[in-house]
């Protein structure tokens, strides 16, 4: 009984603490328009590295959801979240077999960030050699908060949907 009461109190306090960190929710998708010439869109491969800078709008980065719609049956998509100084805050891996079995899937982060500070997430691939990426950020970033998008250190145009 006491243990149950303690758990309820902890859950309540955690809920109150998180409540202060939610700002206005926005939805932004970034990526490439796959209706244009294929040669103008970089294909995924072992050496592909995609980086997206962004500026946090509130105290919790609720979710970065990165998905690719077409994919191989082996390998993984790796995402690393770093601060402006290059310190790694979190790393996630999504095996391709999960993508194949469940359709386009993504990787999420729920992490505290400092409002207005610059962060970067980097996407790399291991064992994937096919289609094009569609990168999405759900309830966390607005157009003004997005920084440079690069593929293999080359700047890319961002498409906002």
What positions do the PLM features span?
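Beta-sheet-rich sandwich/jelly-roll-like modules and their strand-loop junctions
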Residues: 1-86, 97-118, 124-161
